[in-house]
């Protein structure tokens, strides 16, 4: 058990490789990443046995930026017999179970990478799931309750019709979504598809049980670069009154709610109205990430907001390095003013050449 598989958006394999190498080294674990461009996944191989399991436990998954899923895997199973793929897969799971008790496992995902080529296997994976699940249940696995806070999900990751990895992820340190992708439905009345980015961000960064407390009708939000209103829509839907800042036009449907005030101003120059306590700042402006970071820092340092979600666009080559630099600079700015804060960043499914960042100031 010396390998991890990490899913990602195709084209971001190098960022995942750099990130997992950094995170592993912080724990004193060393290895190397196997990267295939545009494959949608990375294999990280540790030099020492059993260290992949340690990484899957000890690297906080919600602190990984570019990985959609993290799991311990077997060696690649190749040349599977189409007449009986299940037997060698069960044997591979049995070998893994000698180190990990799969009696605590609750779910099986038969997956592929998120590429057009791999998606051709999706119908097969869906049909293969039922007989494989039955075979694994005969081993006494997959019997734990899905609501439990410990245990594992079992994964069968097909890279070709006759080649797969088998593995597991920890329930308390993984993505609970199939392929690491949340399935969100585009609201028919939303002004733009960008609304799904903020919806996914809220689902990712804000615990469900806290959402009504942290986003409600008693709060005020500001949306910088709001036009036509995809992000504003998500705040209004949750009851906030929103100052929508943009020279462009906002969707008429948002004006009809009576919950927005359109401010035709430059997002970099706008300041919140005096005597108004702004709770939330959101921002999806197309600008250099270093400039956006400084803008967000200004809002937090001036006490203009308490919580923010914003995007950093990443058109450059050294994307991982740029992200780390921006996040470190923001952290230093806030720490120097003795502010307590929590910062998270994620390359969301609905993000493209960008990441989404969440910062919350604490009392």
UniProtKB/Swiss-Prot annotation:
**What pairs make up the disulfide bonds?**
none
Q: Identify the residues that bind S-adenosyl-L-methionine.
A: 194, 227-230, 246, 266, 284
- Which cellular compartments is it found in? Cytoplasm
Q: Which GO terms describe its biological process?
A: rRNA processing
Swiss-Prot/TrEMBL keywords: Cytoplasm, Methyltransferase, rRNA processing, S-adenosyl-L-methionine, Transferase
The UniProt catalytic activity note for this protein reads: cytidine(2498) in 23S rRNA + S-adenosyl-L-methionine = 2'-O-methylcytidine(2498) in 23S rRNA + S-adenosyl-L-homocysteine + H(+)
The main location is cytoplasm
Of the GO CC terms on this record, one is: cytoplasm
The EC number on file is 2.1.1.186
Q: HAMAP family, alphabetically?
A: 23SrRNA_methyltr_M (MF_01551)
List the PANTHER family hit by this protein, alphabetically.
RIBOSOMAL RNA LARGE SUBUNIT METHYLTRANSFERASE M, RIBOSOMAL RNA METHYLTRANSFERASE FTSJ DOMAIN-CONTAINING PROTEIN
Protein name stated in the entry: Ribosomal RNA large subunit methyltransferase M
Its gene name is rlmM
């Amino acid at each position: 058990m010396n390998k991890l598989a990490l899913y990602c958006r195709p084209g971001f394999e190098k960022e995942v490789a750099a990130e997992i190498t950094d995170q592993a080294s912080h724990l004193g674990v060393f290895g190397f990443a196997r990267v295939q461009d545009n494959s949608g996944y990375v294999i990280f191989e540790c030099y020492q046995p059993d260290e992949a399991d340690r990484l899957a436990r000890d690297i906080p998954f919600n602190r990984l930026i570019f990985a959609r899923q993290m799991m311990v895997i077997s060696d690649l199973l190749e040349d599977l017999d189409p007449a009986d793929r299940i037997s060698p897969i069960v044997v591979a799971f049995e070998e893994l179970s000698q180190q990990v008790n799969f009696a605590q496992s609750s779910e099986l995902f038969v997956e592929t990478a998120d590429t057009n080529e791999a998606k051709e296997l999706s119908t097969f994976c869906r049909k293969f799931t039922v007989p494989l699940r039955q075979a694994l249940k005969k081993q006494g696995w997959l019997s734990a309750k899905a609501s439990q806070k410990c245990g594992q999900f079992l994964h069968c990751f097909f890279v070709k019709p006759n080649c797969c990895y088998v593995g597991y992820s920890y329930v308390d340190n993984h993505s609970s979504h199939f392929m690491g992708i949340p399935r969100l439905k585009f609201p028919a009345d939303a002004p733009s598809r960008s609304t799904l980015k903020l919806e996914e961000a809220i689902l990712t960064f804000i615990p469900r049980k806290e959402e009504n407390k942290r986003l409600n009708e008693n709060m005020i939000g500001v949306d910088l670069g709001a036009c036509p209103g995809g992000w504003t829509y998500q705040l209004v839907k949750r009851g906030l009154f929103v100052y929508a800042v943009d020279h462009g036009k906002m969707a008429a449907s948002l004006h009809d709610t009576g919950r927005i005030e359109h401010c035709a101003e430059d997002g970099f120059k706008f300041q919140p109205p005096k005597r108004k306590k702004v709770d939330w700042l959101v921002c999806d402006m197309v600008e250099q990430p270093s400039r956006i970071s400084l803008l967000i820092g200004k809002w937090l340092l001036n006490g203009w907001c308490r919580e923010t979600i914003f995007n950093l666009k990443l058109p450059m080559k050294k994307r991982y390095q740029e992200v780390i630099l921006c996040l470190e600079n923001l952290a230093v700015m806030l720490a120097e003013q003795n502010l307590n804060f929590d910062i998270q960043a994620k390359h969301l499914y609905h993000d493209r050449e960008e990441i989404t960042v969440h910062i919350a100031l604490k009392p």
